[in-house]
Amino acid sequence: AKGVSLFTYPTAGYFDTFFFALLSSIGGDDYFKKVMSYEKNIWTGSEATQALNLVGKLLTQYTLPQTVGYANNQDYTKNQAALMADKALFCPDGSWVAGEMKDAPRSAGFAWGLTTVPAMKKEDRHLTSFIESVWIPSGAKNKASAKTFIAWLYSDKATGLFAKAGAAMPTKTGTKGLPAEVAPFYTVYDEPGLKSTIGGFKSAKAVPGIDMKTALLDSVDSVASGKLSVKDWQAKVNEASNKLGGH
């Protein structure tokens, strides 16, 4: 539609989960693990090339013009507000966005929703998921009580309390009772063919001046503004990955 862009993003850092799901969608779970483990020249292969070209096209041809100017820690909510004002259709974000933007103006009929990254194969749709962890220290004095508490976290009562607060436990009833505004962020997992991508880059020995976030994510704004070509972006990411992998 006239005046409506396909895409925007809060800040470049939000592309982490976008890339993780996209790489899984293109190359599969085993390929994703290879990328996260810094396999030699993994970013020069056809899968990574396809992913970077797709994102490059999205950034240079279909992104809301205001995005780069507001893609910083002070103004990023203006890009999220653009989504709510029907100036853009899609935006990578987290389930917290509904609460973060609860007081922002919105167009008539606006409602939050969640979908997967583009599917490369039929019935093979990917989302990146963050899962909070709970564990018992080996030196804990009350391990039995701790185990009882952890078990209780998965009870109907506990999942109901989580749902009331807008969060979901990974149980069969975990999405019941969620506020209507945030429910789509979790009920999407009930859809057939949806796969959850979990994980991130493997911890690696520090290399001075090298960081995957800088190479892969912080370059997004430069690609969007035309200051960095996809080819140079790919070379930059591959170099960082190889150095962190010890190649």
Regions found by a protein language model. Give the residues of each.
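Extracytoplasmic/periplasmic solute-binding protein
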Residues: A1-T44, N79, A88
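Paired acidic/hydrophobic, glycine-rich loop segments that form the ligand-binding mouth/hinge
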Residues: T8, L89-G94, G113
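Beta->alpha turn/N-cap motifs
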Residues: P10, D93-M101, E132
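Short helix-loop capping/hinge motifs at secondary-structure junctions, enriched
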Residues: S25-D30, Q61, G139-A146
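Glycine-centered hinge/linker elements that transmit conformational signals in sensory
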Residues: Y38-G69
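Short helix-initiation/N-cap motifs at beta->coil->alpha
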Residues: V68-M84
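Extracytoplasmic/periplasmic substrate-recognition and gating elements
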Residues: D103-A168, D218
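C-terminal capping/gating helix-and-loop segments adjacent to ligand/active sites or protein-protein/ligand interfaces
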Residues: A168-T175, Y186-G245
